[in-house]
């Protein structure tokens, strides 16, 4: 078992993993990979791993891996960032689907999000395009990939998506679930003295409960998680420091 980042870079930190993978493929035909497609610390936080997941699975197949366990959000309430799409992409790639990632994503989004599909794809690509370094499965909202500019662009796109589908339809509910990822990112990055912060937290958890989401942190009750968000924040703009940090009221 080797913990690795989101990219299999033969010249970077993942070189040893790739070396071991190739080595094992030469001595066994029963090679299995346990991979991750989720942020366990923040289920709702955007976790742009689709492109890396696509490339990694293709590489696994090329090397001769027999099976892949692509672990995601296992909480009963679901609602994590793009859970359904990630499961669909992985399932297609693990069969004999040789289409491009864009084709598979469009097929899913057209069927799942309806008229909002083009905006959802734009939203997905906004975060995927912003990955410049490593993506970690315990990243926080103060990660270097999340900026005020990115948050504002996400707000515009996801609101366009909501406006493009009719309230009360299954497509609207699907988009609303994705909207949680923006709302969560926005809320947990607010300063404790931000005007209307309490109202924003109320809005976030009201929607979380309305959609039946039961966990937003791994193995943590929703009640505890709500208390954490109400009393603390993720600090922004702390150079070279991207782990969880709380300022308590």
Question: Which residue ranges define each predicted feature?
Answer:
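Structured mid-domain segments that build the active-site/substrate or prosthetic-cofactor binding neighborhood
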Residues: 3-118, 122
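Catalytic domains of carbohydrate-active enzymes that cleave complex glycans
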Residues: 64, 90-249
